[in-house]
Amino acid sequence: MKTTKNYKFWFATGSQDLYGDECLQKVAEHSQIIVNELNKSGILPYEVVWKPTLITNEVIRKTFNEANADEECAGVITWMHTFSPAKSWILGLQEYRKPLLHLHTQFNEEIPYDTIDMDFMNENQSAHGDREYGHIVSRMEIVRKVVVGHWAAKEVQEKIASWMRTAVGIMESSHIRVCRVADNMRNVAVTEGDKVEAQIRFGWEIDAYPVNEIAEAVQAVGKGDVDALVEEYYSKYQILLEGRDPEEFKKHVAVQAQIEIGFERFLEEKNYQAIVTHFGDLGALQQLPGLAIQRLMEKGYGFGGEGDWKTAAMVRLMKIMTTGKKDAKGTSFMEDYTYNLVPGKEGILEAHMLEVCPTIADGPISIKVNPLSMGDREDPARLVFTSKTGPAIATSLIDLGDRFRLIIKKTEKEMPKLPVATAFWTPQPDLATGAEAWILAGGAHHTAFSYDITAEQMGDWAEAMGIEAVYIDKDTQIRNFKNELKWNSMYYKLNK
């Protein structure tokens, strides 16, 4: 499954014609050197494209509109080498519709005290020009990312790289289409939401299909295709029979293979990138999709259980944002399931009945067939494993009626044994504080979970979408958190 386009980012340098041609020539040379070095760094996940120096209203406006029209342009990086009068930027910024980064840097790292003169001062005015530019962007209330430091520094390049992934998430958000193969679980509140507002705000398209329409696609899959995929399963995963008859076990596995192929063909044909199911509405499906859904998530599809389209879209979004990341540890649909409350060993067991993505697995992955009381179907096959260790984030997008809120929590990890894929987490700053803050914020039991995305990246995405974001981390104090929720509520009510 193709995750994203071949995106690029434009590098636009601001100046003015007050300093003469020689100065402007150096501005252009310096910006080209910066672009070349950024591309050679091996840190940035996407290519940076140099653009000629922006000086006049007309050129700035034309450049930003060309960026809007270029489907491969995922954002513009701006930098003021010299002073650049900000009124020249107003029209271009007004018409610009893509992610924006303000790189507050300068070409030279060190002031040449022994040789400095007015020519050097005029030529290197980022400390001056970037403030002028920053003022107009703030006055126009345009969302942008600001990165400060010398362009050659690794930490600066890493911040640019991080923003690039967020920018791609912003761009790709409007291409996320969720297929609902069932409605929400009856009487459940948190998985509900305004699908029209989600399309207005995020660009998501959420469509429902009768479960038996997709079941027909499953039934249309031929035995040869099913057998070939089952053989792939048996060569790739460990088989845990646990006393079951091998032939009977294999038949259960074959049902999931047929579901995987049928679902994927249905999604590809109708151009969907995420899917939701519900154990209470399975129609002609023989099993609740388990192994099949896990494999689809591994291929990049989003997923939400019990009709949870918001989490399905978020899983897809976060998989997009981590595409091609070196040493990626995985992104998955997840659920807060049960607690360990032993003093000193507090934590949350995160799992779901079946559907946890194997990209987060650590060590061997096995296929098991176990009974499942929900769904009233035959015992489903599923992949089981333990998850990787290390820090991660879990996000919950909720609908508060007047706005969406993204809750972002940081976690740490260890691990027990269960008949489903699992992860065991201690939320920051501790279980009691983290859980209390989560409940106060209205967080769901389903989450979109990732080792490979930072809380800052998800917060930047939320800001670009114009929605509230709250963070639960090592600095969370309940008194302050409750006040933050109250202040946010007032802000979003007044800012309508």
What residue ranges belong to the model's regions?
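Cap/lid and interdomain-hinge subdomains that line or gate substrate/regulatory clefts
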Residues: Y46-E47, H104, E109-R244
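Short beta-strand segments enriched in small/hydrophobic residues
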Residues: T3-K26, H175-N184
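C-terminal catalytic subdomain
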Residues: G300-A423
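Short, well-structured alpha-helical segments in soluble
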Residues: I60-C73, I90-G92, E260-E269
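Long, internal scaffold/assembly segments composed of regular secondary structure
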Residues: E231-E232, K236-G324
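Extended hydrophobic packing segments that form well-structured cores
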Residues: G375-K496
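Short catalytic helix/loop segments, enriched in acidic residues and glycine
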Residues: Q25-S41
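Periplasmic-binding protein-like
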Residues: C73-F83, L101-L103, Y272-T277
